[in-house]
Amino acid sequence: MKNINPTHTQAWKSLEAHKAELSNTTIQDLFKQEKNRFDDYSLTFNNQILVDFSKNNINQTTLSHLRQLAQECALDSAKEAMFTGEKINRTENRAVLHTALRNRTNTPVLVDGKDVMPEVNAVLAKMKDFCQRIISGEWKGYTGKAITDVVNIGIGGSDLGPYMVTEALRPYKNHLNMHFVSNVDGTHIAETLKKVNPETTLFLVASKTFTTQETMTNAQSARDWLLKAAKDESAVAKHFAALSTNAKDVEKFGIDTNNMFEFWDWVGGRYSLWSAIGLSIALSIGFENFEALLNGAHEMDKHFRSAPIEQNIPTTLALVGLWNTNFLGAQTEAILPYDQYLHRFAAYFQQGNMESNGKYVDRDGNVINNYQTGPIIWGEPGTNGQHAFYQLIHQGTTLIPCDFIAPAQTHNPLADHHNKLLSNFFAQTEALAFGKTKEEVEAEFIKAGKSLDDVKNIVPFKVFTGNKPTNSILVQKITPFTLGALIAMYEHKIFVQGVIFNIFSFDQWGVELGKQLANRILPELTDSEKVASHDSSTNGLINQFKAWR
């Protein structure tokens, strides 16, 4: 992968000049200028996903310069480097091959000259067998009862992805009840254990190293809880499985290593739901549906790898997003799914994007000070968000580009709920793009029988400037296949931006310092002695904590 500072490219210079040319052009103007704007600025995937990016402040010249930027930053060779197992995570000397986990063609993928696909398929086969035994009731707990509840214990990628997907695909769930524990706050595990029965609960401990502090603390508490009821160490093997590579510690914990599901160092945590980390997904929706999830992602992988840049959905979203942040001044993006099942989608890609591209050092080790890398990602489902934070998106002083996501078909066709939901989905992007002028506000008042003299003081507050950029992503229906494609689409968008930003998107050194300091502080909390080994603020906080506990 080539190291290219994007600001040194001709395309970046062209974009700077183009920004000035477009500075007095609004989205409203662009729709007047281009009669076929929707057709020219929308793309479809598999006749199941429509991506409309027409409500952005871009024209064909913008897109031409952005595509040139991708080419000058060697995007095509970077894509091939990832797909073919090159060690593009250079700070950890690792390949980046979440795409191999969903490689449904079994085309060989080599890491250090070795094809990884036989091992990938072996773990999938093992997962399939395990799911069949649990779902069918063949697997019994320590009293001979079948499993009714599954508790996934993990954190970060070992929690956010599986939790998001199992929630998104609840219409496909079987009889098993799924629970997710991540926070080292004892409240999380305690409240979960109140809901389950030790005789019928299976715990999945998701930690590659089997040493992650939060995960192992929660796993140990779950083990203690089980043994308090079972009073026999042999019960652990009947109620625990591990998603790990540390066979020694897994066995020491009491888990049968036959029920240990491996994954590899070329699988990053935030890209791991496609691996054994997705076992909770497969248990929740059945292995066939898990395979459909993989199939959807694989189809998006093929599209991303082979579609020309003009038709390439992840690349287009990445380039438009980069334009909004680096040239129009946005520092944040909102992901707004109009589907309650997708209520964790924004949180999932908050990690996916911010942990990947939240970097201030480029691939040459230089501090980045003349362009913006990853944006702040956040969001909530519609229509809840409309009654919470949309006010600022519409009338605030901060530019917030938004992705609106909605299914055309609902899993719950109750009365006219879905039409009302989608009417809001369509209305919001229209309102954000076109706004409401002073003249329109005044006309409304006149129609309501008011005189302009009476309302002149209120008119400014009811004006909407519009010109707020949005993407509309319409999905035919949220299924395992389309969800897999949607997730992969966002993964590749993040990758493209990381390539152009000239950063390493697949490490996360930013999480390490806090961990190191916490390990230093933990022993200081075991007694009541005052501490003086930190700065005055940290000392004061620790000492007050000791006084109050």
Swiss-Prot record:
Keyword Isomerase: yes
Main location: cytoplasm
SUPFAM superfamilies in UniProt: SIS domain
Pathway as given in its UniProt record: Carbohydrate biosynthesis; gluconeogenesis; Carbohydrate degradation; glycolysis; D-glyceraldehyde 3-phosphate and glycerone phosphate from D-glucose: step 2/4
HAMAP family documented for this protein: G6P_isomerase
EC assignment: 5.3.1.9
GO cellular component: cytosol
Gene Ontology MF, one: glucose-6-phosphate isomerase activity
PROSITE patterns xref list: P_GLUCOSE_ISOMERASE_1, P_GLUCOSE_ISOMERASE_2, P_GLUCOSE_ISOMERASE_3
Top-level enzyme category: isomerase
Protein name per Swiss-Prot or TrEMBL: Glucose-6-phosphate isomerase
Entry's Gene Ontology BP terms: gluconeogenesis; glucose 6-phosphate metabolic process; glycolytic process
Family the UniProt entry places it in: Belongs to the GPI family.
Catalytic residues (UniProt): 355, 387, 515
Catalytic activity: alpha-D-glucose 6-phosphate = beta-D-fructose 6-phosphate
Localisation: Cytoplasm
